[in-house]
Amino acid sequence: MPDRRGDRGRHQARKRAVDLLFEAEARGLTAEAVADSRAALAEDQDDVAPLNPYTVLVARGVTEHAAHIDDLISAHLQGWTLERLPAVDRAILRVAVWELLHAEDVPEPVAVDEAVELAKELSTDESPGFVNGVLGQVMLVTPQIRAASQAVRGTGPAEG
């Protein structure tokens, strides 16, 4: 089922994924490792709610594709390096770029809009515009990246 603008469950799942990525970076772990530890904690303690499955999917996806995601973000930063960005902005961009590349049920404008909303909630006054600008540039190349990925896997329209 495609993601829709009013889907607050997905919004909260994205926000939690940003939290996990932020925590993982601060602790020197992968987002997947942090998600796994939270899942174990939820199993052991009744007062700890389990993570939304979409949060776990995003954490695993960002971990699996971290190098490619970071390269893509870095290629579209103008006057910045990934390391100089606020950690929360890095986490937001990583979630959004993963969605742009790998979440086929999430329309690109929704992924960008959700990232901008998260930047408004969690970061500086300048961050929403910055995040929107970077993701707007990334969106220009995502169709080619998705097509190349499908061709490598031997699926989709690139097959011929």
UniProtKB/Swiss-Prot annotation:
UniProt-listed InterPro entries: NusB-like_sf, NusB_fam, NusB_RsmB_TIM44
One Gene Ontology term of the molecular function aspect: RNA binding
Question: CDD domains from the xrefs?
Answer: Terminator_NusB
Q: Does the keyword Zinc apply?
A: no
Q: Is RNA-binding among the key words of this record?
A: yes
What transmembrane ranges does the database entry give?
none
- Gene Ontology terms, cellular component aspect? cytosol
Domain of life of the source: Bacteria
A Gene Ontology biological process noted in the UniProt record is: DNA-templated transcription termination
Which UniProt keyword terms apply here?
A: RNA-binding, Transcription, Transcription antitermination, Transcription regulation
Pfam annotation, one family? NusB
Its biological purpose is as follows: Involved in transcription antitermination. Required for transcription of ribosomal RNA (rRNA) genes. Binds specifically to the boxA antiterminator sequence of the ribosomal RNA (rrn) operons.
Q: Which family does it belong to?
A: Belongs to the NusB family.
Q: Can you say what this protein is called?
A: Transcription antitermination protein NusB
Organism of provenance: Mycolicibacterium smegmatis (strain ATCC 700084 / mc(2)155) (Mycobacterium smegmatis)
From the broadest rank down, the organism's phylogenetic lineage runs: Bacteria, Bacillati, Actinomycetota, Actinomycetes, Mycobacteriales
